[in-house]
């Protein structure tokens, strides 16, 4: 099973594709300065072949463009580690927060609505995640998307230590 891990920042994207259950990393990519017309950086590396490349001065105006660049590299003849994006079985996101959801959840419409409801608490990160997840839903609609919410950590804090 191939699992794509995605970390979406306010102006960055990071990806790593794993073969599971072996936990073998197949490739990784990093995009910095998303939103830039001419200063974005795209770095990709195959951990199978060791081939890497880095593009600087790129126009990556939104997460959609960055995600497409990554998926193109993932299946490219020279650098790709899979033949088709259809080989991706799951996509996991390190998400921030969603109203009423903690821990690990499939990113259903209900969970996404909870993320929208908390945009006022995490406007930068939740907005970025909503855009990226929406793009993956458009490009890979049949692939389950899973969110690991950071707020799960706080559920383990003893009551007497909570503020």
Where are these regions (language model features)?
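Extreme N-terminal starter segment of soluble prokaryotic enzymes
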Residues: 1-4
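A short acidic Gly-Thr/Ser loop motif
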Residues: 6-11
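Short glycine-rich, Thr/Ser-proximal phosphate-binding strand/loop in the N-terminal lobe
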Residues: 12-61
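Glycine-rich, N-terminal phosphate-binding loop and its surrounding beta-alpha-beta segment
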Residues: 47-94
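Conserved phosphate-coordination/catalytic loops
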Residues: 61-64, 123-127
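Short beta-strand-loop/turn "lid" adjacent to the catalytic site in phosphate-handling enzymes
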Residues: 74-125, 146, 152-162
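Internal, well-ordered alpha-helical segments in soluble enzyme and binding-protein domains
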Residues: 111, 129-132
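A structural motif corresponding to the C-terminal end of an alpha-helix
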Residues: 132-145
